[in-house]
Structures are given as structure tokens and as C-alpha cells.
């Protein structure tokens, strides 16, 4: 039998054909860590006893979870990264003011490219599969070993093939697509499998694809990956500073399952507490009052997400009972939002606008929920206590639904505030 897209990339790195279930050790093209995971990896790296990293251009250290530092402990975490970057001359250390949320920043900087094998000490590293590369999250010890050796080990995954048909309706985005899929297959529906997206992918922008690949892990997947097409090429061409290789799936590749997704059938989705699989169409939500809305994150903090929020919020006001927090995913996106007048409209509407940070998403800072509070967020997880108090609630939705709901004071379709 032929190979899936993921298996093709892993086979190329292994120098031979690999099979699902096989354990392999291969070279990596990028190793990533953030201000939570990298300090642990650095501590383990120092125990190995090597005097240099495998390649100072293939390591990315991105402080993003608690930046700007919220307290002494978080400041010390970033300082560990800073000192390590100086000691080993790490080229891709992104200091505060030049940083962004890691999974938006690395593609923007051209650091992850088609055909790459990318590991990151963060579960949403799977985001980069939007660019037709194999990207997956690992633990800090694996990150440490990879910084020393340039290698990582994997079990080759089986794959589920998602064949997309039709087109997105008005106010429907990649966030709605992935919530719809997770609602169908469940949070363990792709456990340790590759979610491979093909068919009418041209109906999805590159930002839609980043969002979908980002949340592959929420279905338990090892990785998410899209076919390479002209949309991928247009994005990569502007950013790539090195050569890359495009891989294609074999026509006779074997999949554990083939699932057809008709995009025409998808309405805006909302995931209810406390799992991303608890999805409902916006038409089935009912009147759910909210206290806070968060628009941003590695899932939905890109320029197109900011544009959607701007279109809905322009000339309107955030409901007096709602706090709206907006954080563009990178400094580059933030600056472009300033140039386009988005930030001005957000502030006029009554939103708080933040520099790039993961803070609210993990209940870290800049938007922590109190007991009994309810948030609607464009983030990727709504587990118990994810954004604050264990008796708070988090609902997940797209930027369009989030912006509209901030105006209404309860969860609504964007059509209701147009």
C-alpha cells in the first residue's frame, strides 16, 4: 500500500519507507519551547553534558504564556530562556516587544516550512501542519534531547482522511469547521492518528487551516496536516528563507477511516463546557448570558480574525455587563491592526486590547475568571478551570460569534447584530 502525507514526510526523514506503529528516530528541522516548557528543557539539557546545541538556527525560544512577565516567578522563567539563548547564541529567541504567540509567530517568520519535521514543547505545535509539514507536541525532556542531538523519536501514526466538499457559508470559518468535526468524532476520535485534510481545501484560507490544524490535538490527534496547494505556496513564498520540499500523499494510501465533510452544512458552532466535543450549532444554543469575551490566541489571533472582529464591532458598543479582551497573536499583526484602524475601533467599542500573550487562554493572567463567571473565547480548550476558577465556565466559538456576543451580552449569531 501507498503512504499518507504524514508517512511520506517521516519516510523521507528516515531514509526508508516507514509503517504505522513503527518506532523511528529522525532528524528535526525545528525545536520549539516557551516560557513554561523551555526552562524545564534547559535544566535537563544542562545535565546531558554537551557544550553546544545541535544547530543554533533550528531552535526557537518564545516567551508567550506570561508576557510581559506577570510576577517574579514568570520573570525568572523568561530569564532562564534569555541566559540560555545568549550562552548558546540561539538565533530565534523572541524577546518581549518582538515576540508573539509561538504558533502564530513561527509561520509568520518563515521558520516552519512544507516538508519539515517540527517538534515543540507545547501541545498545539500541530498548528504548523497547515503548511504541509509534520508538526507535533512533545515533553520538555524530548525538547532537551533534541536541542542536543537534533533528533526525536516517534511512533508512526495511522491516518484519518477528511475529504472536504462544498464551501463555507457567511460567518462560517475554520474554527466552526474544526469544532464541527470534533463534535462528530469526539475528543478521542483521532487518538494518536494523523488528521489529513484534502478535497476542496481551496475553500479555506491559510488562517482557517492554521485554526483547524491547531485544534487537531483536541481530537487526540498526533498531528493535523493539509495538502499543499497554491494558497500554501502564496503564504510560504513570501516568508521562506530556505529551500523546502513538497510532499504528496499516494493515491493508494491506507487510512483507518475516511470522513467526508460538507462545508455547506456547517453553521457557526459553539462548544459548551467542559469539552471541545460538546458542540452545538448557533441555532441550538439558546440564550446563554456571558461575563467575558476573549478574542485572540494561537487559534484565532491572526489578522483575518482581527478583521472579522473589526467588521462586527465597528460603530457598536460592548454590552455593559461584558468584558471584551482582544489580543492579536503577534507584534506584526498588532502593528497592522493599528495601521488599519482596528485597534481604535476596538477601544471605542469598549474592549481592552493587549499585546500578544497566551495569558487568558490558560487562566494565567489578563482575563482570569472568578467563581461562577462565564466566558466565550476563541481559544482552543474549555476544560474545568481552564481560564480561572474551577466553578467558572468557558464556551468556545469563532471570532465572529465572539464579537457579536460581546455586543449582545449573550451568545448570538453574527447575523443578529449586523
Swiss-Prot record:
Q: How are cofactors bound according to the entry's free-text note?
A: Binds 1 [4Fe-4S] cluster per subunit.
Q: Which InterPro entries match?
A: Acnase/IPM_dHydase_lsu_aba_1/3, Acoase/IPM_deHydtase_lsu_aba, Aconitase_4Fe-4S_BS, Aconitase_4Fe-4S_dom, HAcnase/IPMdehydase_lsu_prok, Homoacnase/IPMdehydase_lsu, IPM_dehydratase_rel_enz, IPMI_cat
Keyword Lyase appears in the UniProt entry: yes
Cofactor or coenzyme needed: [4Fe-4S] cluster
Any GO MF annotation of the entry: metal ion binding
Q: Describe the reaction catalysed, as an equation.
A: (2R,3S)-3-isopropylmalate = (2S)-2-isopropylmalate
Q: Which CDD domains match?
A: IPMI (cd01583)
Give the metabolic or biological pathway: Amino-acid biosynthesis; L-leucine biosynthesis; L-leucine from 3-methyl-2-oxobutanoate: step 2/4
Please tell me which top-level EC class this enzyme sits in. lyase
Binding residues for [4Fe-4S] cluster: 298, 358, 361
Recorded E.C. number(s)?
4.2.1.33
What family does the entry list?
Belongs to the aconitase/IPM isomerase family. LeuC type 2 subfamily.
Quaternary state and interactors: Heterodimer of LeuC and LeuD.
Physiological role: Catalyzes the isomerization between 2-isopropylmalate and 3-isopropylmalate, via the formation of 2-isopropylmaleate.
PANTHER family found in the cross-reference section: 3-ISOPROPYLMALATE DEHYDRATASE LARGE SUBUNIT 2, HOMOACONITASE, MITOCHONDRIAL-RELATED
Annotated protein name in UniProt: 3-isopropylmalate dehydratase large subunit
